Amino acid sequence: MNDFHRDTWAEVDLDAIYDNVENLRRLLPDDTHIMAVVKANAYGHGDVQVARTALEAGASRLAVAFLDEALALREKGIEAPILVLGASRPADAALAAQQRIALTVFRSDWLEEASALYSGPFPIHFHLKMDTGMGRLGVKDEEETKRIVALIERHPHFVLEGLYTHFATADEVNTDYFSYQYTRFLHMLEWLPSRPPLVHCANSAASLRFPDRTFNMVRFGIAMYGLAPSPGIKPLLPYPLKEAFSLHSRLVHVKKLQPGEKVSYGATYTAQTEEWIGTIPIGYADGWLRRLQHFHVLVDGQKAPIVGRICMDQCMIRLPGPLPVGTKVTLIGRQGDEVISIDDVARHLETINYEVPCTISYRVPRIFFRHKRIMEVRNAIGRGESSA
């Protein structure tokens, strides 16, 4: 690859993302919109590349966490409707309106300030967030809800486009709290004189498990990337998800250690016999965290343990034998019959699968595959992007 100069890279299978969205499109009622969630650089997969693929596969809208992410998509040529799920500043409402970006609203005082600051000419579309039990953002009070709706109706350039909530436990096998939140949302809908054009409550877990409780839009996030919302509900999903992200490197140095020789900072690993040790150019600055010591990678189709402490830019693995420099190493993905999934990495880190691709940093170039060929290489360092 001429687009990056270190032998570490991630591969993003856009065909897998396309299939995951298309399969959801088939599962849902025909009149249900799909909002593809591409916040956090599309969970580390690549925002604009995933956005385009999701829209091609049947999504009609996009969601991000904050306004800067939405503006970045606009700058990259994305014209589809975008919703900011998080909080925005009242002073930025004009910029959002100019760029046709919808904002989440959940406070009447915020709307009052935005109303005083904005006089047009573009409409500002709002989605009213209701707190049914997540305890994060959202309105809980009927009177506050009515104040917000009245403020929107009073302003000539404010439009109430949507109403939504977020489930805290839709990814758990037990559905008691999910049912409580759903029932509460139905009750809150009665606080409005009429429903806005878009009503949405279902995240990935709810949209896959309860397609009959999605109103007329779902927010498709983690499952779009081929990851189950939780290990517990993975067997309950209506179709198999296709994991899109893999991570690779190459051996840059191979050496034989004698019994008693040490490896890495702190000299925490000691060779017990003659051992072949390989160095690969990836470390915790790339998101391959120090806690992954004692985990494993795949090399020559076999598992190879990570030995010694993971460094900022490199780590060491115990090889099955004297392999040549340049041999491919897979940290996430498949080699032969062996697979390391994102769930495997998350389990070792004692975290959720969402965190793993999000953690792989901008230093790691992304290679995007579409129709089983390289479509684009994105290197956030230096020369940026190139297309095949």
From Swiss-Prot:
Where's the active site on this chain? Answer: 39, 265
Its Gene Ontology molecular function terms?
A: alanine racemase activity; pyridoxal phosphate binding
Query: PTM N6-carboxylysine: at which residues?
Result: 129
Name the pathway.
Amino-acid biosynthesis; D-alanine biosynthesis; D-alanine from L-alanine: step 1/1
Q: Does the keyword Isomerase apply?
A: yes
Q: Name one Pfam family in it.
A: Ala_racemase_N
| Catalysed reaction, written as an equation | L-alanine = D-alanine
Assigned GO CC terms: cytosol
The UniProt record lists the keyword Isomerase: yes
Q: Can you supply a Gene Ontology BP term from the record?
A: D-alanine biosynthetic process
**What does the record give as cofactor?**
pyridoxal 5'-phosphate
Q: Indicate the family of this protein.
A: Belongs to the alanine racemase family.
Q: What is this protein called?
A: Alanine racemase
Whose protein is this, by species? Geobacillus stearothermophilus (Bacillus stearothermophilus)
